[in-house]
């Protein structure tokens, strides 16, 4: 019996990757990179939307209250007066120049007409004109000054519109040691 001889061959070199495989692998890297970037963008957008949504509902303390109209009782409590041309041409009224005209209907006041002079700013209007305005808004049509007192959200203290600025809020709440920043969600 003869033994078959087996020739030992050297191991063949590993096959070289084809150009098609290299192109497919680089395409896969590009696709995965694009998907990762898209995922990061969606996560960032979701975080911004969530922050804006939460801030909208939690920052109510610092945002100004909506300019709602005055109630009937407050409207009736505003002083009425009768216009006279002799009074309007003297003193500070003559310096302003606009106290003889209603800024809403743009007509001059006539002698004996009933007018309202707003207490905080001193602007004058026909009673009918300003009453229609103040039913839907609580500010002066000329200077936009709020006519109703603003209540503090923390303690309920009523203040005039001039005191609503940031400095007053800090002075009013000096006793409060904890301040919650509104920029945090």
From Swiss-Prot:
Reactions catalysed, as given in the entry: S-ubiquitinyl-[E2 ubiquitin-conjugating enzyme]-L-cysteine + [acceptor protein]-L-lysine = [E2 ubiquitin-conjugating enzyme]-L-cysteine + N(6)-ubiquitinyl-[acceptor protein]-L-lysine
Topology of this chain in the membrane: Single-pass membrane protein
Listed transmembrane segments: 29-49
Gene encoding the protein: ATL44
Span of the signal peptide: none
Bias kind Polar residues: ranges: 176-185
EC number: 2.3.2.27
Protein name: Probable E3 ubiquitin-protein ligase ATL44
